[in-house]
Amino acid sequence: MDIKLLDKAAYAGRKFTARYQTAGYYDIRPSGQGFQLAYVPFDAPEERSFDDTFYGDWLEDPIAYGAFEGERLIGFVEGSMETWNNRFRISNICVFEDAARGSGVGTRLMAAIQQEAATRRARMIILETQTCNENAISFYKKNGFDIIG
């Protein structure tokens, strides 16, 4: 597997679908000066998906890296600086193929984008996910991220 910079001219506006399975969600409630998390299982596991595009128009000077098996794109990560507050935002990270999940593809993509944020001297890296995307939450925590709200 190779990690390569994705050419913006070739990928901008190209559509993709991200999929994940989930058995529950984290209920977030205000508590004092912070919040509490409580895991709530669904009655049955569910599959969720959403459609998006590479290099969204709303991103400020985005960059993206792809994970390739030969010529096949099996995953990617995308991010951009938010210059107004010197933060680097990871806008998308996705491993498309179920067989590639848990094999280190996401970790290598995350390392590439974290290095990009360091090169740009970002004061912090942020990202968002759905409260029901259990695997993503676990992955982000494993890679040093904390839940902040």
Task: Please identify what each model-predicted range represents.
Residues M1-D2:
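Extreme N-terminal starter segment of soluble prokaryotic enzymes
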Residues L5-S91, F96-A99, M110-A112, E116:
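Acetyl-CoA-dependent GNAT
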Residues F88, A117-E128:
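Conserved GNAT acetyl-CoA-binding A-motif
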Residues F96, L127-I137:
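Conserved beta-strand-loop-alpha-helix junction that forms the acyl-donor binding cleft
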Residues G102:
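Glycine-rich ATP-lid loops
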Residues A112, T119, S138, K142:
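DNA-binding alpha-helical recognition surfaces that contact promoter or target DNA
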Residues I126-T129, K141-G149:
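Conserved catalytic-core motifs of GNAT/GCN5-like acyltransferases
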